[in-house]
Swiss-Prot record:
Function in brief: Involved in the binding of tRNA to the ribosomes.
Family: Belongs to the universal ribosomal protein uS10 family.
Name assigned to this protein: Small ribosomal subunit protein uS10
GO BP of this protein: translation
Assembly mode: Part of the 30S ribosomal subunit.
Record-linked InterPro entries: Ribosomal_uS10, Ribosomal_uS10_CS, Ribosomal_uS10_dom, Ribosomal_uS10_dom_sf
Pfam families (alphabetical): Ribosomal_S10
Organism from which the protein derives: Picosynechococcus sp. (strain ATCC 27264 / PCC 7002 / PR-6)
Length: 105
């Protein structure tokens, strides 16, 4: 049986702000759909929580502490059958600075 290897672009997005991440995902999916590529996603991945424990007092009172946390929200978008138009449109897409994008071909 001959199997055809299907071309796929996998885009991983990370951000601290969930709303910013969702708007970026919408822009990417709309761009892919406009260029006749099939976009699957955004698929939400588990949110990573990082908690920092800091002493409130600069000198003593170790009982008094404060907790800070950062939440990293993550999404995956798969684009199947991308054309050269799709890749050019994704390269020209203007996304916010607070979103980390990782692309795998």
């Amino acid at each position: 049986m001959a199997t055809l290897q299907q071309q796929k672009i996998r885009i991983r997005l990370k951000a601290f702000d969930r709303r910013l991440l969702d708007t970026s995902c919408e822009k990417i999916v709309d761009t892919a759909n406009r260029t006749n590529a099939t976009a699957i996603g955004p698929i939400p991945l588990p949110t990573k929580r990082k908690i920092y424990c800091v002493l409130r007092s600069p000198h003593v009172d170790k009982d008094s502490r404060e907790h800070f946390e950062t939440r990293t929200h993550r999404r995956i978008i798969d684009i199947y059958q991308p054309s050269s138009k799709t890749i050019d449109a994704l390269m020209k897409l203007d996304l916010p600075a607070g979103v980390d994008i990782e692309v795998k071909l």
